[in-house]
Amino acid sequence: QYFIGLDTYTTDLPFNHSTLVYFRRRMGQITELVRNIISDTLREQIQSLLPDDELRVLITDATAVPIEIRFPQDTSLLNQARLNLEEMLLDMAHQLQIKPPRTYKREAKAKWTAFARKPRRWAKETRKQIKGQLQYVRRDLRYIDVLLAHGASLNERQTKRLAVIRELFDQQMFMYENRTHRVLGRIVSLAQPWIRPINRGKAKQRTEFGPKIDASIADGMIDIERFDFKAFNESQDLATTIDHYFDVHGYYPDEILADTLYRTRENRQLCQRLGIRLSGPRLGRKPKKMDAKQRQVDRDAEKRRGKIERGFAFMKGPLGLSLVRTKTVASIAVTIDIAINLANLKMLLRLFNGPILIFVKYKQESILIHYQIHVSGSRNVT
């Protein structure tokens, strides 16, 4: 209580748990400033401690940050939308002091329960269930429009949810009529409509649900170049990443380490024009005979590029980015920023792990403390 600014001891709670949420949001507004202060203040010291193969080198890559949501299915999304609409209709009927309109919710619940209990669902049964749910949702939306016209109202949360349900209904109706499973801007969660599916093509999971970030490493410090909930091609951001490096350092990097997705013709021409060496072979057919020395250079560059992959693994492991459990856009962004700052702090502790001496004097008593920070592995930081 003393360190948070209270003058006297009290048995009352100084704050509740929601206060920490607002505190983290305030931290999110200055995380980029903190990274800039660290890099500007300690750049010369960091560069003096880094190996030569990491100086004037820019490493860039992209990854997705999974969000904890229920795996989206068309039938479950429509059933949840139907339940939300029934609650809205009941509230609006109470406002107008009229009898709630008939929604056939008992029949809809019985059909949904019978369908959800089946361990294996055939395509015809799923399509039939989607058709029924679409009919229930369309009827409820029509009732809501009528009650709104008669003077009923919805609160802010219900108004936002109604807009999401209308968009979900249009998407599901389009996919049902066209017999497809693809639609632009597909909604996968009613509570978090900003989340979009990100096709990653990984062996473990082909599709991930969460924001995609384009990150870079310069002088050992990780920074975010782009943050978006929609899928994007990170190769188109290489020019912006190079400009960001120039704005921070005042010169262009000598070498860029990136995977094959970045080695497009436009990016290679850009790097050649700026005098930057882009690691890795060119895209297209491999030559019949390749110089052994060049092959070794490409192999070494790929090993050095693995540093950013190890950074992603550290952030998704001990720092918890493998599954983010926060709900709002701001809290998700703050969680990612905090993880990146902690990863940078770990790197700084590894570089500046010299002995520290603290001298404390209190009431004519002197205490001398000697300690040293040791960083071992990726999980134990003491």
Spans of model-derived segments:
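Helix-centered, glycine/charged polyanion-binding patches within enzymatic domains
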Residues: T260-A330, V334
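Short helix-capping/linker segments at secondary-structure and domain boundaries
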Residues: F71, M221, A343-I356
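Phosphate-backbone recognition surface of nucleic-acid-processing proteins
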Residues: Y2-Y22, L278-G280, K286-K293
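Active-site- or DNA-interface-adjacent structural scaffold in DNA-acting proteins
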Residues: L6-Q192
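Electropositive, glycine- and tryptophan-enriched low-complexity nucleic-acid-binding patches
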Residues: Y2-I4, W194, K202-V248
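Short, conserved catalytic/metal-binding motifs centered on acidic residues
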Residues: N16-L20, R56-P66, A215, L238, ...
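Flexible loop/turn segments at secondary-structure boundaries
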Residues: R196-I198, I222-I224, A231-N233, Y262-N267, ...
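A short, flexible helix-boundary coil/loop motif
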Residues: R295, P318, S322-R325, L348-T382
